[in-house]
Amino acid sequence: PIETTGQHAGVLIAKMGNEGIILTTEAAIESADSIEVALADGTVLEGAVKQRDTVADMAVVSIDLSTLSQEQRDKLPVIELGNSYSVKQGDLVVAVGSPAGVIHSTDYGVISYVVRNVQLVDGVGRVFYTSVNGAAREGTFLINLNGQLIGWVTEAYANAQNSGMAAVAGVSDYKAVLEDLSNGVAPPYFGIRGQEVSREQVEAGMPAGIYVVESVSDGPAYNAGIQNGDIITSIGEASVATMKEFQNQLDLLSSGDRVRVMVQRNGTDMYRELEFTVEIRGR
């Protein structure tokens, strides 16, 4: 067999007792038989996959801090998670990790523009575009001038219109996911991109709920029979009319749960109500 190796960057986001929690990209652990984590002082520790999120291309790796001296542990800083909702156009940012495509590289620049209410899988969020170089697979993390993590470069939102700019996922949209990953829990996966039916659309005759822009192929919703154009009106016993309500209900579920989902589907001349059972998976 041919042995292959790769190098990826990560950031230490928490210390829990003797365990260090490192955020990195899913590509960093993809098909890995073993993981080594090199600290800034050159110390190399064995890493273990805590959990991954293939939808958001994130992974958490843990390291055993008990093998370090007290001095080393004291000098190992945890990066603070910032508030990406406060990021605005023109803000100065620093990229660390692998912005040049190799680890230990850095870059700096500005936030060129902010896109709000971007349709994410199972939610909505903010995406920043920046002049900073960014290698998504190798791991590029953006920090503000207070030294706080505000996001990471992703390939999920790159397109021809913003060619030459790096797309950045804001950390605040993923804090609940990071908490799950850090605790070894797979975040719940429903598998849609959706948007709220507006008041004007309801007044025009559409049912209130979440309009399914995309039922992600081979996702739980797709496999249950939910289609593009369906309007989700309830999950379990709770009505959902906003993406926040949808996310709140999804957060109550775990991988393996089976939940009843009520949908309005547009027919030739009217909407009809359908019931589906969706089996939640881990992301």
Q: What residue ranges belong to the model's regions?
A:
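A conserved glycine-rich beta-strand in the N-terminal activation segment of trypsin-fold
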Residues: I2-T25, V44-E46, E80, T106, ...
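Active-site loop architecture of trypsin-fold serine endopeptidases
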Residues: E3, A32-D33, L68-L76, V96-G109, ...
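Catalytic-histidine neighborhood of serine endopeptidases
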Residues: G17-A59, I63-S66, K75
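Conserved PDZ fold ligand-binding element
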Residues: N18, I22, I150, A221-K244
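Short glycine/Trp-rich loop-beta-loop segment that forms part of the substrate-binding cleft
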Residues: E80-I103
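PDZ/PDZ-like domain micro-motif
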Residues: R137-T140, S198-A204, V216-I231
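C-terminal cap/linker of serine protease catalytic domains
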Residues: L145, L149-G205, M270-Y271, G282-R283
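PDZ-domain C-terminal substructure recognizer with occasional recognition of PDZ-binding tails
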Residues: A176-Y189, R199, T233-I235, E245-R283
